[in-house]
Amino acid sequence: MSATLSAYRNALRATKVVFRHDLPILTAARTQIKENIRNNSNLKDTTEIEEAVKKLNDVSKFLISNIVQGEKQDDGKYFLNFHEKTELGDNESIKQGKKNLGSLAGKKGSSIRSCKD
């Protein structure tokens, strides 16, 4: 199977996983992917083709790992539809970042007050 066809199928699978509960968005995403494939079908240069395939693979990876659909519930809260491929961070990068923020990083003090009207 060609790399282009494989990337195309992976993109369609990614949209199916991410947008499974939202038919209008699923349809729009798939239409956009198909449109981009058609627009790039006239590429002849192998480097341009490889770049287009890489871009499509990157889009698929981004969709699968970073996009989560949310549904508003009757109580006004949102229910997020995580799936098994959603990238969940462990907050280690946030903890590491606090060390470099300066003297107020992660500290509570009485000198910091909120303004009340």
Swiss-Prot record:
An annotated GO BP: mitochondrial respiratory chain complex III assembly
Principal subcellular localization: mitochondrion
Presence of the UniProt keyword Iron in the record: no
Transmembrane annotation, as ranges: none
Region annotated Disordered, chain positions: 91-117
MF terms (GO), sorted A to Z: protein folding chaperone
Top-level taxonomic group: Eukaryota
Keywords: Chaperone, Mitochondrion, Transit peptide
Quaternary structure, from the entry: Interacts with RIP1.
Family (UniProt): Belongs to the complex I LYR family. MZM1 subfamily.
PANTHER family: COMPLEX III ASSEMBLY FACTOR LYRM7
Function: Assembly factor required for Rieske Fe-S protein RIP1 incorporation into the cytochrome b-c1 (CIII) complex. Functions as a chaperone, binding to this subunit within the mitochondrial matrix and stabilizing it prior to its translocation and insertion into the late CIII dimeric intermediate within the mitochondrial inner membrane. Modulates the mitochondrial matrix zinc pool.
Protein name as it appears in the record: Mitochondrial zinc maintenance protein 1, mitochondrial
Native species: Candida tropicalis (strain ATCC MYA-3404 / T1) (Yeast)
Lineage: Eukaryota, Fungi, Dikarya, Ascomycota, Saccharomycotina
The encoding gene: MZM1
